[in-house]
Amino acid sequence: MRLIIEPNYEQLSKWAANYVAAKIKAANPTAEKPFVLGLPTGSSPLGMYKNLIELNKQGVVSFQNVITFNMDEYVGLPKDHPESYHSFMWNNFFSHIDIKPENVNILNGNAEDLEAECASYEARMKAVGGVDLFLGGIGPDGHIAFNEPGSSLSSRTRIKTLTTDTIIANSRFFDNDVNKVPKTSVTVGVGTVLDAKEVLIMVNGHNKARALQQAVEGAVNQMWTITALQLHPKGIIVCDEAACADLKVGTYNYFKDIEKDHLCPCSLLK
């Protein structure tokens, strides 16, 4: 597993965006052979999305032959609700780039049969050849998507009950009222994410330091679902200095040394 340590959130976001753009360009996708991207919501990827929008406007990368699958969605929240992940993705990313609306896939949290919706989502990923690059962020408890602590590391797309910690954390988007936060979600599983050809996770801030320490130095453990990334042949974490607070000095120095030629975002797009 690679660990890319950037000085701050701005550089982390630029590195992630340039990495995504470089992967899409290298694949040279076509309508017949598109590039398939897994996408997260939340605060962690916002900077990356802004950078990708700029790269798209500059003509550096096109999303015309890119198919996307989002990680998760709340259950029971209307699609047009300002805090739905449909709204989040269109407001912060899709409406600003040249992606075809029919290539955007987001779980329907209002489906009559949620289990059928989850099974269909997995089938759609398989039908397009699987996800080439899955992007993600993590919570302070190390959860990826809505795979809360205790989730099976081989889990697939399914319905999940949110923990009180996650509900409290997400209440900042709902007028700080926990009663307005949906209590359930539909989410890709840990196994779904691990099926991708590559996985890139963004981790920023002191509040994620313990989760990053577990991800890099801890044992694979269902109570910290991010640790499953250790099992992936092409897993990358890009983080900022603040998130490294709990890493051993030796671990920090090791990754700084072996990645020293790859830390500049500009090195990715030549």
Curated annotation (Swiss-Prot):
Keywords: Allosteric enzyme, Carbohydrate metabolism, Hydrolase. Pfam families: Glucosamine_iso (PF01182). The record marks 151, 158, 160-161, 254 as: Part of the allosteric site. The active site is at 72 (proton acceptor), 141 (for ring-opening step), 143 (proton acceptor), 148 (for ring-opening step). It catalyses: alpha-D-glucosamine 6-phosphate + H2O = beta-D-fructose 6-phosphate + NH4(+). GO terms for cellular component: cytoplasm. Pathway: Amino-sugar metabolism; N-acetylneuraminate degradation; D-fructose 6-phosphate from N-acetylneuraminate: step 5/5. One of its GO terms (biological process) is glucosamine catabolic process. One of its GO terms (molecular function) is glucosamine-6-phosphate deaminase activity. Its EC number is 3.5.99.6. Allosterically activated by N-acetylglucosamine 6-phosphate (GlcNAc6P). Catalyzes the reversible isomerization-deamination of glucosamine 6-phosphate (GlcN6P) to form fructose 6-phosphate (Fru6P) and ammonium ion. HAMAP family: GlcN6P_deamin. Belongs to the glucosamine/galactosamine-6-phosphate isomerase family. NagB subfamily. This is Glucosamine-6-phosphate deaminase. It comes from Parabacteroides distasonis (strain ATCC 8503 / DSM 20701 / CIP 104284 / JCM 5825 / NCTC 11152).
